[in-house]
Amino acid sequence: MDNKNPQKLITSELLANHRFNFAKDDKGGYDANEVDAFLDQLTKTLIHYEEMKNNEQELKNAYDKLFSDRDQILSRCAKLEADLNTFYENGYANKVLINRVQELEDKLEKLPDRYTEKLERIEKLLKKVIKHWTDGEDISNFEDEFF
């Protein structure tokens, strides 16, 4: 039933006013068709209200589940964040950095000698450039076969 169509619903006012206002038949009783139509309408209205109540309960349960899921996700995030902070506080970041530097050193040791010589000259040049920038050291007399 549609809530927007009030003719299809039985209101308490209609029920109170119509309870004993059925037409009489020729035998002094109520008109059976009118009573049946009224009871059918009453039954449909009750079924409609029951469906609406069930829908409301389903929506309420879904809403509660949504918030319980949200709370579970937030608690997991808080736990993961605490674990991550513990890792960093225990030097996890330093361990990762140390492992990375060790990997780079291992790669450097495996390079052929000609590459290591070039890298040493580049390192020497960079040290001079850094000194020039920080201390103002003159690099015009820098002699190397690199250039």
Curated annotation (Swiss-Prot):
Source organism superkingdom: Bacteria
InterPro entries attached to this UniProt entry: AH/BAR_dom_sf (IPR027267), DivIVA_domain (IPR019933)
The protein, known as: Uncharacterized protein MG211
Organism expressing this protein natively: Mycoplasma genitalium (strain ATCC 33530 / DSM 19775 / NCTC 10195 / G37)
